[in-house]
């Protein structure tokens, strides 16, 4: 009967000549097994450190991106020590789509791609954009685990051009933290003033809805008298109307409305 004692087997293997093919194969297998185990153990031990390193890199990249958005640097600096996150939102449902790198998503490219974009019903297209992407990025800022601010990309037709900007909301999802436009070609000296700090500074603290939750944000002619009204620019009524319409579109059912609703009722962890 064969001796199955491992010590006996080991002694027998060691007694083989070094030129023995069997001994060479066994030694090679043992070395490979030992090295593989060492690598696996090291990887497991280093994984928490690697994850922390990747998270620091992601936060730094996110902060750099958000601070590069026109008018957003002060909002981020003012928020203090926050955790930043970019998520990709399915606009129709408001659900967050899991992707490897949401920061690399090109919303304009998808909106222009007939294989991927969405035709907005004419009756709902108050922003005058015709088509939109099916997905859009949203930037979340958290402090101590609670949602502090959210930044949303917006666009829509003005008087003479397409207006591109970002709307920032406070964590209550009703109060405007800021509005900035980074691209437009409106009438010089009139509509172009939507990019001036003096006008953009009118937005923080305004409300997007009334006490009943109805979406009411608007740019009015003259002075605004309601919490959801912002002073218009003299001589740029049509541009102001365009701003009103694009904000209501992107905050509504065909924009980020479903996503904001999911955040509000807690179906998405803010």
Spans of features found by a protein language model:
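Flexible, solvent-exposed loop/hinge segments and secondary-structure transition points
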Residues: 8-270
């Amino acid at each position: 009967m064969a001796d199955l004692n491992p010590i006996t087997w080991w002694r027998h293997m060691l007694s083989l000549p070094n030129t023995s093919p069997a001994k060479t194969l066994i030694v090679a297998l043992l070395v490979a097994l030992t090295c593989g185990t060492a690598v696996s153990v090291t990887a497991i031990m280093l994984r928490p450190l690697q994850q922390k390193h990747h998270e620091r890199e992601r936060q730094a990249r996110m902060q750099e991106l958000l601070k590069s958005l026109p008018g957003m640097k002060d909002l981020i600096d003012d928020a203090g020590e926050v955790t930043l996150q970019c998520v990709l939102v399915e606009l129709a449902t408001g659900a967050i789509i899991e992707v490897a790198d949401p920061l690399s998503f090109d919303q304009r490219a998808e909106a222009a791609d007939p294989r991927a974009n969405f035709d907005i019903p004419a009756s709902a297209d108050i922003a005058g954009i015709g088509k939109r992407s099916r997905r859009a990025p949203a930037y979340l800022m958290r402090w101590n685990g609670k949602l502090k601010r959210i930044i949303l990309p917006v666009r829509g037709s003005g008087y003479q051009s397409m207006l591109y900007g970002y709307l920032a909301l406070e964590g209550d999802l009703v109060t405007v933290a800021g509005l900035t436009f980074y691209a437009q070609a409106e009438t010089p000296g009139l509509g172009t003033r939507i990019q001036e700090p003096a006008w953009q500074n009118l937005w923080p603290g305004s409300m997007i809805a009334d006490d009943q939750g109805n979406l009411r944000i608007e740019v009015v002619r003259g002075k605004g008298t309601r919490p959801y009204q912002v002073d218009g620019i003299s001589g740029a009524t049509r541009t102001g109307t365009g701003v009103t319409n694009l904000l209501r579109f992107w905050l509504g059912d065909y924009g980020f409305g479903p996503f904001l609703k999911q955040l509000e009722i807690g179906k998405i962890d803010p």
